[in-house]
């Protein structure tokens, strides 16, 4: 069975665990509709992405 040669310091343990935290997703307000959407994603309500119509507009 493998055994560590040295004890892991609290600093090194913390640096290893620093990437484990969950991050809250970021949202940007759409300029045209005012809806919140993810950056670099299309707006599903209007179907627009970077000023172009990508998909048909969703009718409510």
Swiss-Prot record:
UniProt KW Nucleotidyltransferase keyword: no
Annotated family: Belongs to the bacterial ribosomal protein bL32 family.
InterPro entries: Ribosomal_bL32, Ribosomal_bL32_bact, Ribosomal_zn-bd
GO cellular component assignments: large ribosomal subunit
Gene: rpmF
Amino acid composition bias (Basic residues), ranges on this chain: 1-16
Organism the protein comes from: Rhodopseudomonas palustris (strain HaA2)
Biased composition (Basic and acidic residues): 17-44
Protein name, as recorded: Large ribosomal subunit protein bL32
Gene Ontology MF, one: structural constituent of ribosome
Matches recorded under Pfam families: Ribosomal_L32p
């Amino acid at each position: 069975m493998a055994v560590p040669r040295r004890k892991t310091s609290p600093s090194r343990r913390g640096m290893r665990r620093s990437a484990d935290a969950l991050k809250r997703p970021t949202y940007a307000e759409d300029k045209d509709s005012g809806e919140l959407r993810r950056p670099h994603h299309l707006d599903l309500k209007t179907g627009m992405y970077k000023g172009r119509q990508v998909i048909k507009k969703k009718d409510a």
